[in-house]
């Protein structure tokens, strides 16, 4: 049997109240484990940790199921080590380029468009919510 989320229409409602952790960049390229990059959908907004800084943005549904735009993105402005700053910058750029969302083997898939027109996909695992 398919999970309930997989059988519902792809609207932002299926993401409401959910929290996710980035587990793969394009083509399964692993992400940094510590600190985790997170994504939460709450109260009509998205936000989380980009690795060093907190971020927030507005999700905008498209005209067709599964279409999604995120942005503009605002962040806190903490000084970050170079390694974190690079992955954080990459994540925030890709997040603002998101065009579609869906689910792949229980993971949230956010597809975005690179500057050269190629399509990439970030994969997220759902975070357990405390009781």
PLM-predicted stretches and their roles:
Residues 1-131:
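Lipid interaction determinants
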């Amino acid at each position: 049997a398919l999970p309930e989320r997989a059988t519902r229409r792809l609207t932002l409602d299926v993401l409401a109240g959910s929290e996710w952790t980035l587990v793969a960049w394009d083509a399964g390229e692993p992400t940094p484990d510590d600190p985790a990059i997170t994504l939460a959908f709450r109260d009509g907004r998205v936000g989380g940790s980009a690795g060093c800084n907190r971020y927030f943005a507005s999700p905008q549904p498209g005209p067709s199921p599964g279409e999604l735009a995120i942005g503009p993105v605002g962040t806190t402005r903490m000084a970050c080590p170079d390694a974190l700053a690079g992955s954080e910058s990459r994540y925030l750029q890709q997040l603002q380029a998101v065009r579609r969302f869906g689910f792949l083997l229980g993971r949230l898939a956010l597809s975005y468009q690179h500057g050269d027109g190629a399509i990439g996909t970030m994969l997220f695992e759902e975070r357990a919510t405390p009781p």
